[in-house]
């Protein structure tokens, strides 16, 4: 963090629970100018915090419930987070050139979170801006409207089955090992013909493609599913590249340059330059 320090506990907002993540990702903006939009503001405590974090710029909030007396220079609007009409109005009246920072702390429901992101990212978030989704992990709560009990394995991906006993390789694994052993590039002399070296590398990789594990299903309920879609969007430059095979016109004009996922939040950073993809 390069900017001034703020203590969110003084404002009564739950942002205090993960303020260090905010400081790491957007702290360099504190003390300067920023146009801010927050979806879901309840009593408006976070609007007071943003008003102090940024010395100038619009501070706006949208909530289903009215906020008759917003703090400081903040302005509050009543409406649904996914309603383009209210979102357009807020932007038109406060940040016609776009917002530098948008925080979604509203419904925490996948359908509405996705709708808000899709519209605001393309229409009202400035190039170089940051979009934040708070409390996405409620998708793992069975009691949440679109949540669901997690049924997967919580052990690290590299850890073998819990039994700890070495399992004999099956037919597919046996074939894979033998093909890789023959095609291992290190077994092909560096002085061999380039085409032979290329064939060895291709065979080595093909052995995994044909017999190895290629899919790793995960929890895709609610906002957790949205976060995983965002991971796909972060790799848009690879998806639309020559090896990805997806039409290049599918790449957003201002794609994602970086996505940071924490247990509570997702920070999505937007490219400053059109066509600038993620660093993959």
Residue ranges and their predicted role:
Residues 1-103, 107-132, 137-280:
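A short alpha-helical cap/connector motif
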